[in-house]
Amino acid sequence: MITQKISEELNKALAKMGIHDTQETKILVDKTKNIKFGDFYTNIAMILSKKNNKSSLEIAKEIANNFEQDLFLEVNLQPPGFLNFKLKAKDHENLLKQIYYEKDRFGQFSKKNITYNIEYVSANPTGYLHIAHAANAIYGDILANLLKIYGYDVETEYWINDAGNQIDKLAMSVLVRYLQLQNINIQLPADAYHGQEIHLVAQTLYQTYKNQFINVRLNEKYEIDDDIANQEIKNFAVKYLLNEIKNDLASINTFIDTYTSENWIRNSGRILEVLSKIKPYTYTLDGALWLKTTTFGDDKDRVLIKSDGSYTYFTPDIAYHDYKFNKTNTTKLIDVWGTDHLGYIARLKAAMNALGYDPNNLEIVCAQVMKLVKNNQEFKLSKRSGQSLTIKDLVEIIGKDALRWFLGSSSMNSHVIIDVDIALSKNNNNPLYYVQYAHARANQVLNKQVYELDFKTDLLTETRERELLNQLHFYKQTIANAANNREPHRISNYLYDLAQIFHNYYANVKINNDNNKVLSAQRYTLVWCVKQVLANGLAIMKITPYDQMY
């Protein structure tokens, strides 16, 4: 990785200068904005000037003088203190060989012996997945792919909230619809689940059990008055809807490794184990058991067991995270939540602290709100159900590739707006089309005639050829940056930039030169490598690379 090579040489040069604190100083190595200055640059001299009471140019010159000779074709200085590096043709040749021989493995890093557990989606199994869940699912899925490619072992996980009031309400809603199917005069309460999927669960329940529950009723609290029937209906409804959730996720190419049940955690004895572990940080007040989360930075203490003896939502969640940390080889946890859970972060980290875990090994990322617009008007309701847009609706409207692109190309720090007209357009205004077209165009060039490959780059002197080479060099660094910063959108940004350079190259440079077969071979090799890297980047996002546009 060329950026790593430059960073290593910078550290050697700085060590010769007596500067050894570079671990605290983030060395930026990036592509130059203007190719005439060089291929890559660093701003380290400007950072160090503030610490060493020297001008940036003076430090940059001293660094350059301490570089080993012949490492780069050229090292030059640019005010106010940039160090620019022009690469040798051999660096480019080695890159093209690596891409060609590694093919779809290009971009993968060596194993790091660290295992991440990434939990995402984790919607209550009370209905179909909706528009907000799509953003959560796609972010988590692409992040998992990134971390795997970056060398980590990764397990993905879904926390099934199959206990508590919402599941009782689900069973009650299904029972009412089931009884209505048999012409029983009973009304569904206003605060019950009214979605189309509840009708489908009830119909399937009837097909399976016939009239077994026909005499079951609700009490004055709108609770099912038969404990056995209540449990059977709950189990049936959760299983049915969880299967629908898995189908929804599969429709957007998302497959989660492990589904962990809250009921299982509750019945496994793990909650009692956790309560024993954190006992030194608990106290009783007003008949309730509290955890002293303020000891670890929370704004107030939190209830674990209510005065009626029931657990709060917090308690099984603590046990669940303890379970995840205790899985074989699990080192770090990442939870992907919605923004409505922002206030929950401090208390969960405090609980991990109380359990003796490093709270920094639990990362929590919150997905932002997303919306769909068409003709500047927001889509809010599904035509099919009259309710919030589901993942099924989104796939039907714009397709899974477009959904993965537009959600995967958005920062988690900003609201996501998907313009349907742009997402469906087949022109350069659609960034996904633009990138897929670059792959198809490269494929078209390579299939047009028989060509030879030549990994040398001495004849690739066009500005756009150097820009393409530098962008290819930066692919692995982009993966590292995206993985380390938990920013999957860096991949789509990279692909768009690569596509843009390639489209400009195609429009301005004749790739096949009948008068110079060696030049043609070098250009075909470059195009082959561009196509491969486009395909590899799209694979991280689980998006189809087209060989021809339709």
Swiss-Prot record:
Reactions it catalyzes: tRNA(Arg) + L-arginine + ATP = L-arginyl-tRNA(Arg) + AMP + diphosphate
Keywords: Aminoacyl-tRNA synthetase, ATP-binding, Cytoplasm, Ligase, Nucleotide-binding, Protein biosynthesis
Pfam families: Arg_tRNA_synt_N, DALR_1, tRNA-synt_1d
Disulfide-bonded cysteines: none
Chief place of localization: cytoplasm
Signal peptide, first to last residue: none
Enzyme Commission number(s) of this protein: 6.1.1.19
SMART domains associated with the record: Arg_tRNA_synt_N, DALR_1
UniProt-listed InterPro entries: Arg-tRNA-ligase, Arg-tRNA-synth_N, Arg-tRNA-synth_N_sf, ArgRS_core, DALR_anticod-bd, Rossmann-like_a/b/a_fold, tRNAsynth_Ia_anticodon-bd
GO molecular function, a single term: ATP binding
Enzyme class: ligase
Motif 'HIGH' region, residue range(s) on this chain: 123-133
Oligomeric and partner information: Monomer.
Protein name from the UniProt record: Arginine--tRNA ligase
Designated gene of the protein: argS
